């Protein structure tokens, strides 16, 4: 029995000893494994130069820097993609469209001529040099961000003078009119042999030409056809327009002074003429007794016309017959435009009374002086289908000289500041069914004209007067949505006298640095401006045709002043009045 127990106890002791050694072996193996792993990790860390915990603090910063580098690289690539997209999707199609437009204009012009060949309308439609394709009649500067007055005119550039000057001391050249289409330009002025105040006889110079560039890249206006209309007709206040058939011109024919004309009972004779590409001039008198039956005096606006939708559009103005239907419909209508940051101190009722009286100045016998727009169908038959639009005086000021302009798809009417409002005005104009509609104007507070008191350059209140001078602005700078931002023009920088012609770029309140013709005592009168671009060089130029005093040969010499439009960081010069 005891032996059996001893045998069992011995077996238990042996089993426990085996278990103990197994445990020791397992622990030893586990420790060895841990040591080996630790050694391996340490070796790996050492070999890779890994950071210690204290180094890990800078990891987020390094990650941010790496992210910035990646973002910058992606942004740079995006700029390249954007430029490629702009070139492929925007600029190239636009250039092709401009080329197509010019070609279509030339084809249209040729089509008109072919259709009128039997009527001897002329052949050989001219066209500007290719450098100007897409740079005429377009929105030349499209810029949403830059200060308008950071654009400014260069010094006047020497170029070929395409305008004849007086050749005697008593000669007078006055009243320039200019218009340029995508294919050619038209120019006209009045010539009086015995001083600028003679109303009994004058002749009219009319020319057609194109823009050229010389071998050295200089611009010149090349006259291809011209004529001097020296006959028994006394054409006055002529406006010219470049159309597909040549140079269309609207003139009044007068034999009396302006005051006498307004005191007469019948409308003023008017004629629609054309200088064709063959150099021949033809003319037709309009039926003014029907077209202007409510008028006692009627004149073209002097400024250029515009070819729109198969018709030529001219600004006209004059006096209405008292109590005629056209006069009655305007009774009580008026508009008051205000100066920028310079409010009229007069009582509102008094301002309204003076504004109403401004349409009937005493100089013209109390007649209502009205603004209007005349459109004529362009065909081989002159004077065809004339339509007169008389805008309401709730939009326009007293009737005055003016100009119709087309830039891009926008049309404008410039109205001379003959009444109390001195800053330049450009009315947006829409056309439909042969008639025009004018809208509230853009005003350019620093682009003023001199005038007699109480309608001088700094005037701010409605008054009755006939004063000022013709100095039109040309739409130059636009927003991308085609809204007008700024204009170019040559103003007479004087309070009352016609002195000190100066060119500048203007926004609604101020002007750029200026380029003066000469000293502040230089006498001048009418100016008309047109801008265009040399697409090859992407340079924008503006032409101001200005009447400048000429003491040796005639009272005035008409000079084409050419500037390039430059850009800097902006030099603003506000008019203080």
Curated annotation (Swiss-Prot):
InterPro entries: Hemagglutn-neuramid, Hemagglutn/HN, Sialidase_sf. It is found in: Virion membrane; Host cell membrane. It is a single-pass type II membrane protein. One of its GO terms (molecular function) is host cell surface receptor binding. It holds the Pfam family HN. Residues 1-22 are intravirion. It catalyses: Hydrolysis of alpha-(2->3)-, alpha-(2->6)-, alpha-(2->8)- glycosidic linkages of terminal sialic acid residues in oligosaccharides, glycoproteins, glycolipids, colominic acid and synthetic substrates. Residues 46-571 are virion surface. Disulfide bonds join 172-196, 186-247, 238-251, 344-461, 455-465, 531-542. Its EC number is 3.2.1.18. Residues 124-152 are annotated as: Important for interaction with fusion/F protein. The keyword Iron does not apply. Signal peptide: none annotated. It is an enzyme of class 3 (hydrolase). It comes from the Viruses. One of its GO terms (cellular component) is membrane. Residues 234-239 are annotated as: Involved in neuraminidase activity. GO terms for biological process: symbiont entry into host cell; virion attachment to host cell. Glycans are attached at residues 119, 144, 341, 433, 481, 538. The C-terminus (head domain) is involved in binding the cellular receptor. Belongs to the paramyxoviruses hemagglutinin-neuraminidase family. Homotetramer; composed of disulfide-linked homodimers. Interacts with F protein trimer. Interacts with host CG-1B; this interaction inhibits viral adsorption and replication rather than internalization. Mediates the viral entry into the host cell together with fusion/F protein. Attaches the virus to sialic acid-containing cell receptors and thereby initiates infection. Binding of HN protein to the receptor induces a conformational change that allows the F protein to trigger virion/cell membranes fusion. This is Hemagglutinin-neuraminidase. It comes from Newcastle disease virus (strain Kansas) (NDV).
């Amino acid at each position: 029995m005891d032996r059996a127990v001893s045998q069992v106890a011995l077996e238990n002791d042996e089993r426990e000893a085996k278990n103990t050694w197994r445990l020791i072996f397992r622990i030893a193996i586990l420790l060895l494994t841990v040591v080996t792993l630790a050694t391996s990790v340490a070796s790996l860390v050492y070999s890779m130069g890994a950071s210690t915990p204290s180094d890990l603090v800078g990891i987020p910063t390094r990650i941010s820097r790496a992210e910035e580098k990646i973002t910058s690289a992606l942004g740079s690539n995006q700029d390249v993609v954007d430029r490629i997209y702009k070139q492929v999707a925007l600029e190239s199609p636009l250039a092709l469209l401009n080329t197509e437009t010019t070609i279509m204009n030339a084809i249209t012009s040729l089509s008109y001529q072919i259709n009128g060949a039997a009527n001897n309308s002329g052949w050989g439609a001219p066209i500007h040099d290719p450098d100007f394709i897409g740079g005429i009649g377009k929105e030349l500067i499209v810029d949403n961000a830059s200060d308008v007055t950071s654009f400014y005119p260069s010094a006047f550039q020497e170029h070929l003078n395409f305008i004849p000057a007086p050749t005697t001391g008593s000669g007078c050249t006055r009243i320039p009119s200019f218009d340029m289409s995508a294919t050619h330009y038209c120019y006209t002025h009045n010539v009086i042999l015995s001083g600028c105040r003679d109303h009994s006889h004058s002749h009219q110079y009319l020319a057609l030409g194109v823009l050229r560039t010389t071998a050295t890249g200089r611009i010149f206006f090349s006259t291809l056809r011209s004529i001097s209309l020296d006959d028994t007709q006394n054409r006055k206040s002529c406006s010219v327009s470049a159309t597909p058939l040549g140079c269309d011109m609207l003139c009044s024919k007068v034999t009396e002074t302006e005051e006498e004309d307004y005191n007469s009972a019948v409308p003023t004779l008017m004629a629609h003429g054309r200088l064709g590409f063959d150099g021949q001039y033809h003319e037709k008198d309009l039926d003014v007794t029907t077209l202007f039956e409510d008028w006692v005096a009627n004149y073209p606006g002097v400024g250029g016309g515009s070819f729109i939708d198969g018709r030529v559009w001219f600004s006209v103005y004059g006096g209405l017959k008292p109590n005629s239907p056209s006069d009655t419909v305007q009774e009580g209508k008026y508009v008051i435009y205000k100066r920028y940051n310079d409010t009229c101190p007069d009582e509102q009722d008094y301002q309204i009374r003076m504004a109403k009286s401004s349409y009937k100045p005493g100089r013209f016998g109390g007649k209502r002086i009205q603004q209007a727009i005349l459109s004529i169908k362009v065909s081989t038959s002159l004077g065809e289908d004339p339509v007169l639009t008389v805008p309401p005086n709730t939009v326009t000021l007293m009737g005055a000289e003016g100009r119709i302009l087309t830039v891009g798809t926008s049309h404008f009417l410039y109205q001379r500041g003959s009444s109390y409002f001195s800053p330049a005005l450009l009315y947006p104009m829409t056309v439909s069914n042969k008639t025009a509609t004018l809208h509230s104007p853009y005003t350019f507070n620093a682009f003023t004209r001199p005038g007699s008191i109480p309608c001088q350059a700094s005037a701010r209140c409605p008054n009755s007067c006939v004063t000022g001078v013709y100095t039109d602005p040309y739409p130059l700078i636009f927003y991308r949505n085609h809204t007008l931002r700024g204009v170019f023009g040559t103003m007479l920088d004087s309070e009352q006298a016609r002195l000190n012609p100066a060119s500048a770029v203007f926004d609604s309140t101020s002007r750029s640095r200026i380029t003066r013709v000469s000293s502040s005592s230089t006498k001048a009168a009418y100016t008309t401006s047109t801008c265009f671009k040399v697409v090859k060089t992407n340079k924008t130029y503006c032409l101001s045709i200005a009447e400048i005093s000429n003491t040796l040969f005639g009272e005035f010499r008409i000079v084409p002043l050419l500037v390039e439009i430059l850009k800097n960081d902006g030099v603003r010069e506000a008019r203080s009045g």
